[in-house]
Regions:
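Short capping/connector residues at structural and topological boundaries
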Residues: 12, 150-151, 157, 197, ...
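Acidic/His-rich, divalent-metal-binding segments that scaffold phosphate/diphosphate chemistry
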Residues: 20-161, 168, 172-175
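Terminal helices and disordered tails flanking the catalytic cores of nucleotide-processing hydrolases
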Residues: 1-59, 66, 231-331
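Alpha-helical scaffolding flanking metal-ion-dependent phosphate/phosphodiester catalytic sites
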Residues: 106, 126-140, 158-169, 173-254, ...
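Short alpha-helical linear motifs
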Residues: 89-93, 147-155, 185, 205-209, ...
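Detector for Asparagine
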Residues: 49, 56, 61, 80, ...
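Residue-level signal for alpha-helical context at structural boundaries
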Residues: 61, 65, 72, 87-91, ...
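Residue-level signature of transmembrane alpha-helix interfaces in integral membrane proteins
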Residues: 150-151, 210, 233, 295
Length: 331
């Protein structure tokens, strides 16, 4: 069982300080930048291939996935992980199966949050691969259940909740090297207060990677359309998680989640008390409720031809009254 104490931040820093070859490698690659659109496309293609293999009862090869994770981890450690990648994961629409996009989105979230947690390179890579493959067994759930628009009946819910065992079986079958992936996939729906499934585990009995991914998976699901419901805004999702789910998740991880994504993150749509609508273009750590905004709809509900910016730190009479989704804007 991997425990949270194994994800040692201090040990990570010591390792980087004393590993001259690693420091030299980072220095040589510091000018290399990750192309976010290309990486996202390749990650989706990899996941499509994995899910197709699993659907056909074949063993997937994880070599390409490990290389993809290495790329994004290196970018994170170099300090040039593109913010555009996070925006794509938060606000992009599913272009393929939602299982594919969800896996890639949660992976991106995990790398950003792992950076906040200051995980060492090896642990960050393990977290990334675990996030990418955490839902792999769900491809075996019948589509009439997985894509059902109405609420699931009890017997259908029972079928759905078997998929963590399928994920465990699939990943465990890849060998001892990937046991941590199998355990994480089995535990990702468990909750700190014992309210999760399939085993009703509590606290430290839950795999630490699964504890991180559990928060991010829920956030991703809430902020993207699903067959059963429309997505929430970032603000609504965060409020829901903090208000109703805080006992289900580790407090340290909820804090890291908020520090990673903020209250009004870049690119999110907000409505001011004046009635104007804008998009967040800059956040301020010291005043998270008062970001800089580019106005796109004026107070008379008319699209502006030339967007103007407002820094809410300098406009004390104005404040954010609501957070919106693209659907709200286009309604």
């Amino acid at each position: 069982m991997l425990r949270f104490s194994d994800l040692d931040k201090k040990g990570a820093k010591k390792q980087v300080d004393t590993d001259d070859s690693f420091v030299e490698d980072l220095s040589q690659k510091s000018s290399i930048k990750l192309d976010p659109k290309d990486w996202y496309r390749r990650a989706c293609r990899f996941m499509m291939n994995v899910l197709e293999k699993v659907r056909n009862r074949e063993k997937p090869n994880l070599t390409e996935g490990e290389a993809l994770i290495e790329e994004i981890v290196q970018a994170s450690l170099r300090g040039n992980l593109p913010q555009e990648l996070l925006i794509m994961a938060q606000y992009g629409n599913a272009t393929r199966s939602f299982l594919v996009n969800k896996a890639v989105n949660v992976t991106i979230f995990a790398i950003f949050m792992g950076k906040t947690l200051e995980l060492p390179k090896e642990r960050l890579a393990e977290l990334g691969l675990a996030a990418l493959l955490h839902d792999v067994g769900k491809v075996r759930v019948p589509e009439e259940i997985l894509l059902k628009e109405a609420a699931l009946k009890d017997d259908e819910l029972a079928v759905l909740r078997k998929y963590p065992h399928d994920s465990f079986e699939i990943l465990q079958g890849l060998g001892d090297k990937y046991h941590y992936l199998a355990e994480c996939a089995l535990h990702v729906n468990e909750r700190m207060d014992g309210s999760g499934f399939p085993q009703g585990l509590e606290g430290d009995a839950i795999n630490p990677y699964a504890r991180i991914i559990a928060v991010l998976e829920l956030y991703e699901a809430m902020t993207h359309n699903r067959p059963q419901r429309h997505k929430l805004s970032h603000f609504e999702a965060v409020k829901e998680i903090i208000k109703t789910k805080k006992s289900a998740f580790q407090r340290e991880l909820l804090k890291a989640f908020l520090n990673t994504f903020g209250i009004f993150p870049l690119h999110c749509l907000v409505k001011l008390n004046s009635g104007a609508i804008g998009r967040v273009i800059q956040t301020h750590e010291e005043q998270p409720l008062r970001p800089k905004i580019e106005i796109i709809v004026d107070a008379q509900n008319k699209r502006v031809k030339i967007p103007r910016t407002i820094d809410l730190r300098e406009q004390q009479v104005l404040y954010i009254a609501d957070a919106l989704t693209e659907e709200n804007l286009n309604a």
